[in-house]
Amino acid sequence: MFAKSATIAIVLAALAGFSAAVPTADCRTSKTCSSGKVALVAPAAPVGSCSTGKVQCCNSVEHSTQPHVNNLLLGLEHFGLVKGLIGGLTGNVGIQCSPLLLSGNSCTAQTACCENVHFNGLIAVGCSPVNLSLL
């Protein structure tokens, strides 16, 4: 039990450092904005479609080769929290993603359709950006 608690503490400490390293920008005009959780974002799906899963609201979208993104993914894989995310991973990674309910929530950041969400949005793999105004 102690080992699991220590692992979680290390990952949370890494996330805190990761959050401080992410640049801030206007999420409506840029794919890079504030910090947080991670989701893989693939090339854009047809506008308005979300057949892959729930729509996510991500505060930032960064390329998987960015050192801080890659280090976070490697750390999660190293501690056995995720498996197989790094090998062959290409594309963008969304930062701080949470489910978006079309009925009432609004997203002032980057919206994306995601099919595999891990750790309550910490990592969501298989995402595509989506324009909700056209849904």
From Swiss-Prot:
Pfam family name, one: Hydrophobin
Summary of subunit composition and partner proteins: Self-assembles to form functional amyloid fibrils called rodlets. Self-assembly into fibrillar rodlets occurs spontaneously at hydrophobic:hydrophilic interfaces and the rodlets further associate laterally to form amphipathic monolayers.
Role played: Aerial growth, conidiation, and dispersal of filamentous fungi in the environment rely upon a capability of their secreting small amphipathic proteins called hydrophobins (HPBs) with low sequence identity. Class I can self-assemble into an outermost layer of rodlet bundles on aerial cell surfaces, conferring cellular hydrophobicity that supports fungal growth, development and dispersal; whereas Class II form highly ordered films at water-air interfaces through intermolecular interactions but contribute nothing to the rodlet structure.
Keywords, alphabetical: Cell wall, Disulfide bond, Glycoprotein, Secreted, Signal
Protein name from the UniProt record: Class I hydrophobin 15
GO MF term set: structural constituent of cell wall
Family affiliation: Belongs to the fungal hydrophobin family.
Signal sequence segment: 1-21
Carbohydrate-modified residues: 131
Chief location: secreted
SMART domains linked: HYDRO
Cellular compartments per GO CC: extracellular region; fungal-type cell wall
Compartment(s): Secreted; Secreted, Cell wall
UniProt lineage: Eukaryota, Fungi, Dikarya, Basidiomycota, Agaricomycotina
InterPro entries: Hydrophobin (IPR001338), Hydrophobin_CS (IPR019778)
Annotated organism of origin: Pleurotus ostreatus (strain PC15) (Oyster mushroom)
Disulphide bonds in the chain: 50-113, 57-107, 58-97, 114-127
